[in-house]
Swiss-Prot record:
UniProt enzyme class: lyase
Gene giving rise to this polypeptide: hemH
Protein name: Ferrochelatase
HAMAP family: Ferrochelatase
GO CC list: cytoplasm
EC number: 4.98.1.1
GO biological process, one term: heme biosynthetic process
Pfam families: Ferrochelatase
UniProt family annotation: Belongs to the ferrochelatase family.
Keyword Metal-binding included in the entry's annotation: yes
Pathway annotation: Porphyrin-containing compound metabolism; protoheme biosynthesis; protoheme from protoporphyrin-IX: step 1/1
Lineage: Bacteria, Pseudomonadati, Pseudomonadota, Betaproteobacteria, Burkholderiales
Location of the protein in the cell: Cytoplasm
NCBIfam families assigned: hemH (TIGR00109)
Length: 362
């Protein structure tokens, strides 16, 4: 407070440097409509597969009240006293096992998606700047918005890369984007993509990914569609995530021409002791094996880029559970990643959402 008062008493000394274009110029250059920016946002990842980097990432992720919806005074001692003290040690070798030469798979594939959308929009004559951000970790949302603003973007479309809406994923991206944009003196116009769980471009790309895999490797007895889990209380409080997942599963099943008994919908990545969405993926796979199912394929339609939850939890842990229970053939169908149909579909989605904004010649 004293420092602020001090600055008001001697304002000239503390004024920021006046920009080259005088804001009080009586004859300013004509002001155009500005440029359009696209902000693709995924969850985030540690910078490297080390305990320290994982601890920093988890600390930011699990401190978000949208993610852990219990009182702060109860959760923060648990987070700092137990979770951050123990979890990084367990996760470090798991991250190391999936790490790519270029870095974290989630970051690498997300960067390729951003590059693909940038090129795709340009090829269609849509002039838009494209940036990638992570909700937790780097590149951060504030840094990405700053980069777009520095390139003259006064319209920003934020695209959370979560097909199914959840408060703990999509809504927290909206929170972060609006929080940072709200601090700007010259605020950009904002739009958000809420969900795309039933978008034809997404469904077609995901179904095509499965069909292409089967064309190369043959079809199994069962297809398991595993979505990230949520605590049941999230749904009871009004979160539409569960319904979105079922809609996606139905659309994919119909597009692939499968009967209901050929598909299982499950939920993975349970955290803590609360009851989460069921059935759980790993026990379901073990039970299928005990029932005599020897061949399963698992796809994760909620993940548009491969990450720890798909490459380690599904492809390794769930495989082990299925085989240990008597299963013979377990195959994980990779996420959409940077496959051309998905890049094309994501570009379609972005282009549609930009309608009405100045995307012509800059």
């Amino acid at each position: 407070m004293f420092l602020r008062l001090f600055k008001y008493l001697w304002p000239e000394r503390y004024l920021p440097e006046i920009p080259a274009q005088d804001p009080f110029d009586e004859n300013p250059p004509p002001c155009g409509p500005g440029r359009v920016g696209v902000l693709l946002v995924n969850l985030g990842t540690p910078d490297e597969p080390t305990r320290g980097a994982i601890r920093r990432y988890l600390g930011e992720f699990l401190s978000d009240p949208r993610v852990i919806e219990i009182p702060r005074y109860l959760w923060m001692p648990i987070l700092h006293g137990l979770v951050l003290a123990m979890r990084p040690k367990k996760l470090a070798p798991r991250y190391a096992g999936i790490w790519m030469e270029e870095g974290s798979p989630l970051l690498v594939y997300s960067q390729r998606q951003a590059a693909g959308v940038r090129q795709g929009l340009a090829a269609r004559g849509v002039h838009a700047e494209v940036e990638l951000a992570m909700r937790y970790g780097k590149p951060s949302i504030p840094a990405a918005i700053t980069a777009l603003r520095e390139r003259g973007c006064d319209h920003i479309l934020a695209v959370p890369l979560y097909p199914q809406y959840a408060a703990s994923t999509t809504a927290t991206v909206v929170d972060a984007v609006t929080r940072h944009a709200g601090r700007l003196r010259d605020q950009p116009a904002l739009r958000f993509v809420k969900r795309f769980h039933n978008d034809p471009a997404y469904v077609e790309a995901q179904a095509g990914r499965i069909a292409e895999f089967w064309q190369a490797h043959g079809r199994p007895q069962k297809l398991v569609m595993s979505f990230h889990g949520l605590p049941r209380y999230s749904i009871e409080l009004g979160d539409p995530y569960y319904r979105d997942c079922l809609d996606t599963a139905r659309l994919l099943r119909e597009r692939l021409g499968l009967r209901e008994d050929e598909v299982e919908v499950t939920f993975q990545s349970r955290f803590g002791s609360a009851r989460w969405l069921e059935p759980y993926t790993e026990p379901t796979l073990a039970e299928l094996a005990r029932q005599g199912v020897t061949e399963v394929d698992v796809v994760c339609p909620g993940f548009v880029a491969d990450c720890l939850e798909t490459l380690e939890e599904i492809s390794q842990e769930c495989r082990d559970a299925f085989v240990a229970a008597g299963g013979r053939q377990f195959r994980y169908i990779p996420a959409l990643n940077d496959c051309p149909p998905w890049i094309e579909g994501l570009t379609d989605l972005v282009e549609r959402q930009l309608r009405g904004w100045p995307t012509g010649n800059p």
